[in-house]
């Protein structure tokens, strides 16, 4: 990489660290190209990204961001997984690490909070924002459905009473 390319890469990575909902740092030593491509495609499908960066450039890119506390994690062969949703990157990384022992989670960051490996693991167990929105919407809709049923019940009962009277009059 030439100096201009490095500068551009650091600027791009700095924007990533500033804009991401969460960042996960992991070792990938010994992982095959096929495994890394599979990992990248799973992360992309979930709405995240995986990058491999030189540790020195990643540390420079971290300066001036909320995630600056994770700069000590960049030792050895490290990768960066990030997403706008705070739950997506940790969830995909932890799911992939369960089936692949070559991916070792070192830690991460969510906003100003620096996470160790256990913190990333516990963050991965939380439901995503979309799942939480769906649950909240379901909780909001349930009472409305019940209220509509209660309001409509007297009218339907009244209609049944009129229908019964009409049938009684016809029979008589």
From Swiss-Prot:
SUPFAM superfamilies linked: Ribosomal protein L10-like
A GO term, aspect molecular function: large ribosomal subunit rRNA binding
Any one of the GO CC terms: ribonucleoprotein complex
Keyword RNA-binding attached: yes
Keyword Cytoplasm in record: no
Xref: Pfam families: Ribosomal_L10
GO terms of biological process kind: translation
Keywords noted in UniProt: Ribonucleoprotein, Ribosomal protein, RNA-binding, rRNA-binding
Lineage: superkingdom: Bacteria
Quaternary structure annotation from Swiss-Prot or TrEMBL: Part of the ribosomal stalk of the 50S ribosomal subunit. The N-terminus interacts with L11 and the large rRNA to form the base of the stalk. The C-terminus forms an elongated spine to which L12 dimers bind in a sequential fashion forming a multimeric L10(L12)X complex.
PANTHER family: 39S RIBOSOMAL PROTEIN L10, MITOCHONDRIAL
Function text: Forms part of the ribosomal stalk, playing a central role in the interaction of the ribosome with GTP-bound translation factors.
Family: Belongs to the universal ribosomal protein uL10 family.
Identification of the protein by name: Large ribosomal subunit protein uL10
